[in-house]
UniProtKB/Swiss-Prot annotation:
Binds 2 Fe(2+) ions per subunit. It catalyses: octadecanoyl-[ACP] + 2 reduced [2Fe-2S]-[ferredoxin] + O2 + 2 H(+) = (9Z)-octadecenoyl-[ACP] + 2 oxidized [2Fe-2S]-[ferredoxin] + 2 H2O. This is Stearoyl-[acyl-carrier-protein] 9-desaturase 2, chloroplastic. Keywords: Chloroplast, Fatty acid biosynthesis, Fatty acid metabolism, Iron, Lipid biosynthesis, Lipid metabolism, Metal-binding, Oxidoreductase, Plastid, Transit peptide. It comes from Arabidopsis thaliana. The record marks 224 as: Confers substrate specificity. The gene is S-ACP-DES2. Converts stearoyl-ACP to oleoyl-ACP by introduction of a cis double bond between carbons 9 and 10 of the acyl chain. Exhibits delta-9 palmitoyl-[acyl-carrier-protein] desaturase (PAD) activity. Involved in omega-7 monounsaturated fatty acid biosynthesis, especially in the endosperm oil. Preferentially expressed in roots and flowers. Belongs to the fatty acid desaturase type 2 family.
């Protein structure tokens, strides 16, 4: 991935010409069009208003092509399962939420604003702590923060799930209450990291803010198919991934001497762990009620691959921004291919997939066999990929990140 990036402009033009450069659509008499050299022929614009309209529409499309998405695949019979689980969710799921009055808030970790002298003193202390932290760490921390800030997309996506979505925006079903309260808890994560990064002075906040706007506007390709089986499997995986990622940024912050930042990342990781436990409990209950349908859904999601929610990340410059951010995260050990396989192994053990027996159809048994051998296959692929990376790393490719004022970071 990194070795193909000979030029940002070249990559941008290859993957999405509209991002790199665009020219008016013309019909040229007697010559082919070869920008940017001026043409010495007469040209007649064809339907310029339509061209402008099409260009405007494309401005708001994701930077990456999103394939045709399948919708509403759950059967009525399986929808009834979620209806029957409402009492269970009321008693078991909502217990993983914390009351607002007992919850931490971003201001608990930030400089005090009610005392001007103390505020400036604490900001200076914060900047002194962060000024020696390397750029690659900030690239990953910014990427993590942007992922958290795209929370509107995640709430919207969860509310596409048939049988559990919030039908009114204020529904009192336990599923709807959970999604709103989970969103409220998650909202603090992006708020806190955003403010801390702003005060550090180490990142270009305008480019960070542009990336957030681009990402929320692009949405995500969840592959849920409006199916709550798929949705809760995905969130189980994703919450564990964010728990690992924030936990590792906490460890690195400690290494770099910023104990406050370490506490921030560790506190966020603890929230993610609690949310992971809640979502894995839902899937555990589904395995109890419908082992055949659940194991098939899990196999289906793994065949499609669990894609991180910020995979459509873009800053208006780098069409491969998410891949570059992920490559840096892999290199410094925040989130790696090893973690991906480890999460799958953890969930397979948690849900005792290998022990499933009675009640599985032929398709269910095939899904079980596929899942139980998948981690080993992923690790073999990972080893081959690592070998290729080692060979390629001799050239030490680097990429410029707008988030850190265009400075280059090794991939």
């Amino acid at each position: 991935m990194a070795l193909l990036l000979n030029s940002t402009i070249t990559v941008a033009m290859k993957q999405n010409p509209l991002v790199a450069v665009s020219f008016p659509r013309t019909t040229c008499l007697g010559s082919s069009f070869s920008p940017p050299r001026l043409l010495r022929v007469s040209c007649v614009a064809t339907n310029p208003s339509k061209t402008s309209e099409e260009t405007d529409k494309k401005k708001f499309r994701p930077i990456k092509e999103v394939p045709n998405q399948v919708t509403h695949t759950i059967t009525q019979e399986k929808l009834e399962i979620f209806k029957s689980m409402e009492n269970w969710a009321q008693e078991n799921l909502l217990s993983y939420l914390k009351p607002v009055e007992a919850s931490w808030q971003p201001q608990d970790f930030l400089p005090e604003t009610n005392d001007e002298d103390r505020f400036y003193e604490q900001v200076k202390e914060l900047r002194d702590r962060t000024k020696e932290i390397p750029d690659d760490y900030f690239v990953v921390l910014v990427g993590d923060m942007i992922t958290e800030e795209a929370l509107p997309t995640y709430q919207t996506t969860l509310n596409t799930l048939d049988g559990v979505k919030d039908e009114t925006g204020g529904s009192l079903t336990p599923w709807a209450v959970w999604v709103r309260a989970w969103t409220a808890e998650e909202n603090r994560h992006g708020d806190l990291l955003n403010k801390y990064l702003y005060l550090s002075g180490r990142v270009d906040m305008r480019h960070v803010e542009k990336t957030i706007q681009y990402l929320i506007g692009s949405g995500m390709d969840s592959k849920f198919e409006n199916n709550p089986y798929n949705g809760f499997i995905y969130t189980s995986f994703q919450e564990r991934a964010t728990f690992i990622s924030h936990g590792n940024t906490a460890k690195l912050a400690t290494t770099y001497g910023d104990t406050t930042l370490a506490k921030i990342c560790g506190t966020i990781a603890a929230d993610e762990k609690r949310h992971e436990t809640a979502y894995t409990r839902i899937v555990e209950k589904l395995f109890e009620i419908d082992p055949d349908g659940t194991v098939q859904a899990l196999a289906s999601m793994m065949r499609k691959r669990i894609t991180m929610p910020a995979h459509l990340m873009h800053d208006g410059r780098d069409d491969d921004l998410f891949d570059h951010y992920a490559a840096v995260a892999q290199r410094i050990g925040v989130y790696t291919a090893t973690d991906y396989a480890g999460i799958l192994e953890f969930l397979l053990r948690r849900w005792e997939v290998e022990k499933l027996g009675m009640g599985l159809s032929g398709e269910g048994r095939r899904a079980q066999d596929y899942l139980c051998t998948l981690p080993q296959r992923i690790r073999r692929l990972e080893e081959r990929a690592n070998d290729r990376v080692k060979l390629a790393s001799k050239s030490k490719p680097s990429v410029s990140f707008s988030w850190i004022y265009g400075r280059e970071v090794e991939l």
